[in-house]
Design a protein with these regions (language model features):
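Compositionally biased terminal segments of proteins
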Residues: 1-195
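Non-Sec secretion/translocation targeting segments of pathogen effectors
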Residues: 191-229
Length: 229
């Protein structure tokens, strides 16, 4: 999102995606080798099917988390001066699904920023296009749960108390709009949706981060790795 100027907030991680699951492990090995060749310390913290998380410490002591994952592709990636990036529509879908799935404070901040470019209903349409298990009512509950994180969680993301208060007010508006739209245009919940109950409370601060891409992919792209910032 930072690379597309979709949001301005502190971040300490880098996400890399490929539409080919078998490419994840070779990409992890190649990246780790290249970084170590530059003097960085690299540790693989987590590894699973189609996903790895690395902690990288540069020679000057800067630390960053890097996640490499398999993810379905809705749109062709775009080329910028420094490399290929996920299409903005793809980023919008992923961030909406991240809020839908884990209700983290940063997800709410990201989706709020996206509404400057994408109407809420378009975000929902993109999310449903990528994951047929998406449900607007569940997203409404996830927004409410994310808004319940303490002010400190939003302060870490660069929001003042006043900005956090405005965001929580917007959440009430968005929740009402989502529930109204879902009532007027009801859809049958898919099995995937029923596996994701509405968040009842925000996760505790010590809860390990769930990767944004851990939602089940429903489509398969043909392009190579792209990154999301």
């Amino acid at each position: 999102m930072l690379a597309h100027d979709l949001v301005a907030r502190p971040t300490q991680d880098l996400d890399l995606f490929t539409p080919v699951a078998s490419e994840v492990d070779p990409l992890v090995a190649a990246l780790a080798e290249a970084l170590r060749g530059q003097g960085a310390r690299v540790e693989v913290d987590r590894r699973g099917p189609g996903f790895s998380r690395l902690t990288v410490e540069t020679v000057d002591g800067h630390q960053v988390a890097v996640e490499i994952a398999h993810d379905a592709r809705l749109r062709a990636s775009v080329q910028l001066d420094f490399g290929r990036l996920l299409h903005p529509d793809e980023v919008a879908a992923d961030k909406t699904l991240a809020l839908f799935g884990r209700a983290a404070a940063r997800d709410l901040v990201d989706v709020a920023a996206l509404t400057d470019r994408y109407p809420l209903q378009q975000l929902c349409a993109l999310a449903e296009e990528k994951d047929s298990g998406f449900n607007a009512s569940v997203l409404a509950d996830a927004m409410s749960a994310a808004a319940e994180h303490p002010n400190d969680a939003f302060a870490e993301l660069g929001l003042s108390e006043e900005a956090t208060s405005r965001l929580r007010s917007k959440v009430q508006e968005w929740r009402a709009a989502l529930l109204t739209a879902n009532t007027e245009n009801p859809t049958r919940p898919s099995p995937a949706a029923t596996r994701r109950p509405p968040p009842l409370a925000p996760p505790p601060p010590t809860r390990p981060r769930r990767p944004e891409h851990d939602l089940p992919p429903t489509r398969h792209g043909r392009e190579g790795p792209s990154l999301s910032l």
